[in-house]
């Protein structure tokens, strides 16, 4: 679907910068922000995100994480501009080459191979270098804040939790909290649509607003869920085999899927 910028109250500098671009709204993914792909003859494609400003806005977080991630040598969008205007935040970024792994025309074995190697590379970064703390205490506190503010969409809960209230889900978070954390730098929303591939190879991470130091099961849980949804249950084990040790803990996979219901 195409959209025109004059229907949107853009910040002045962005309006000037984006003159002549054609706008196409993106519909894949679960981002709370409006996402547009911008194209113009003879110019590189860009992506623009827009969301309401407020205590649960994430675009400033995403910009900070993209800048940090690029500094670690991991492919991701370049931050071109971050603006606030008329009660909204705007993030303009470069496009990453290729297609996301949920859409790429490659075989399932290659999809899980790219996903595994991409996460393995991210998880190899020294956590001491990462300023974004997503350990259990911080994420449980964030989940509580979102619940108390009415920001949790109970209608979007996974099938096994349909009919639950956010309070019931939060009680489960507390009761089943993991006793240990195997800390790495995690993407935070490691689903197939957030990993890009070009010519069958990893080309970058996108939607990085929840990147931070957390248990590796944060990423493995969402990756397994996404692989099941997009490719089928049979491809989870090949993905985990390609990812390699340490062995995954089913209870942690389940807990981090529960945590994701709050975000």
Question: Which ranges hold each PLM region?
Answer:
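An alpha-helical support segment within catalytic cores of ATP-dependent transferases
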Residues: 5-16, 121-188, 246-249
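Short, surface-exposed alpha-helical segments at coil->helix boundaries
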Residues: 7-8, 63, 233, 237
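ATP-binding pocket architecture of kinase catalytic cores
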Residues: 25-132, 180
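A cross-family signal for key residues in well-ordered alpha-helices
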Residues: 67-70, 224, 257
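Localized chelating/binding microdomains
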Residues: 111, 213, 260
